[in-house]
Amino acid sequence: MKTTKLLIPTQKEAPNDAKIISHQLMIRAGLISKLALGLYSYLPIGIRVLQKVENIIRQEMNKSGAQEVLMPIVQPAELWKESGRWNKYGAELLRFIDRHQREFCLGPTHEEVITHLARQYLRSYKQLPMNFYQIQTKFRDEIRPRFGVIRMREFIMKDAYSFHIDEASLQETYEVMYKTYCNIFNRLGLNYRIVLADSGSIGGNTSHEFHVLADSGEDTICFSDKSDYAANIEKVTFFKQEKTCQSTMVESKVLTKEKTSIEDVSKFLNVKKVNCVKILIIKIKDGFKALALRGDHELNEIKIHNLFGDFEFSTNNEIKNLGLKKGFIGIKNLDIDLIVDYSASVLCDFVCGANECDYHLIGVNWQGIKFIDADLRNAVDGDYSPDGKGKLMIKRGIEVGHIFQLGTKYSSVMKANVIGESGKAVTTTMGCYGIGVTRIIAAFIEQNHDDKGIIFSQAIAPFQIVIVPINYNKSTRVKALADRLYQQFIKASIDVLLDDRKEHVGIMFADSELLGIPHRIVISDTHADNGSVEYKARNKTNKIEVKFDDALSFIQTKMI
């Protein structure tokens, strides 16, 4: 490809709404163009990268034995009502009515459609297991699209769905897909972690997420510094601890006028937040509950949902009607059940509210207090790993893949049955496996860039090498050598870009670096005199003189 035949709308500055580096560089390098909030067009350079990502995914999925299909993005409401998700999914599901007054939606995912296909065509246990995948557009009406292609409304996803006669078969395919995802992300050159995860609105039991480590990530992940343990922060489980402290203080009440936050109270009383207990009041189906946590810990809402089902934080009026004072709630004289986090239940001589406006208690202990202890909190950096090996490190991550063991969540309600070996109908067991295709590019850039631009790997770079001929349109010798080398690369199946523009060499260099092309060859009249070319790798600073006749073989060694 020659640059004069290619749209490369590079920019010196990124738009003001581009807050993270991947968004800035994808705009500046001309990979994408914003159409509306959460909607982006992929330009020719971006398409080249996108297709290479898709090809790697497709190759590994095919190698795993999965079969490619393509399902409509427009889905009839009947399927979603049948699964029970039509009303549960929320505002992210874009619903519409066609000219015949029939209800449809734009698919944010395809569990219903694939289950419908399975019940049409899978009849016998002899056909199982069967794994289908597609690379298809999705639409989720995100309330707050941001970070460029990381959180879009319309995006491309690889989603796969497997069908099995039993849990044992599902486990086998799940392990195959786990390894397949590792192969994909390894080939893409991503620094990632695999974590235990919550299944969210998709449903199911066992679930793993694949996170690319990046400071701009929206997710918080935890992993041990001494073992392979890793989990989404919402999934880290803690266990009951042995109490090791002994009380040495006499409980007393102190004036803490207008000090309603743990931060303010700990500073005012000159105690660490770890020695404070905070109380949260929640409303559940059958009443109210008081939740007690250590002052330096945060509530894990998923754990609370798992304990009590749907819940809400109580309003100021509800707290007042319970006879409590917001900001001064304590553990004593409560008329509602008290649930105490494991880490708070082993404290001695702690600070908590006095259930009286402008007062707190110090030197408080649990003796005589009726409560139930449970795991209520999120992990923090330095916590002991749940597997007993090492301590937890907490990092930000961008989720690029998620695999689920769905079980019979969809197949049972949609009657995706097969005839089993006994001759009786058996409900199929399902797995679900997703990769955010468009998100991968941004995640890669977050990990691979410098002040000059993107640093693509050979696997997904728009071009493997760029030839920059100085005075290409003035020097016949330079043009002849550049054209000759260009043809050699093409014949060797090397993805090459020849910069044949009438531009200053500085602009040509800047564009090639911004685009992240891994290898660069420079040819000038001086090089023509010497029978050589200049080579530079995008991720290196040094330049190498290479004999012109050796240039092809030299580059081929770099491609290995």
Curated annotation (Swiss-Prot):
It catalyses: tRNA(Pro) + L-proline + ATP = L-prolyl-tRNA(Pro) + AMP + diphosphate. It comes from the Bacteria. PROSITE patterns: AA_TRNA_LIGASE_II (PS50862). Its main location: cytoplasm. It is an enzyme of class 6 (ligase). GO terms for cellular component: cytosol. It is found in: Cytoplasm. One of its GO terms (molecular function) is aminoacyl-tRNA deacylase activity. CDD domains: ProRS-INS (cd04334), ProRS_anticodon_short (cd00861), ProRS_core_prok (cd00779). The keyword Magnesium does not apply. Keywords: Aminoacyl-tRNA synthetase, ATP-binding, Cytoplasm, Ligase, Nucleotide-binding, Protein biosynthesis. Its EC number is 6.1.1.15. The keyword Ligase applies. GO terms for biological process: prolyl-tRNA aminoacylation. It holds the Pfam family tRNA-synt_2b. Belongs to the class-II aminoacyl-tRNA synthetase family. ProS type 1 subfamily. NCBIfam families: PRK09194.1, proS_fam_II. Consists of three domains: the N-terminal catalytic domain, the editing domain and the C-terminal anticodon-binding domain. Catalyzes the attachment of proline to tRNA(Pro) in a two-step reaction: proline is first activated by ATP to form Pro-AMP and then transferred to the acceptor end of tRNA(Pro). As ProRS can inadvertently accommodate and process non-cognate amino acids such as alanine and cysteine, to avoid such errors it has two additional distinct editing activities against alanine. One activity is designated as 'pretransfer' editing and involves the tRNA(Pro)-independent hydrolysis of activated Ala-AMP. Homodimer. This is Proline--tRNA ligase. The gene is proS.
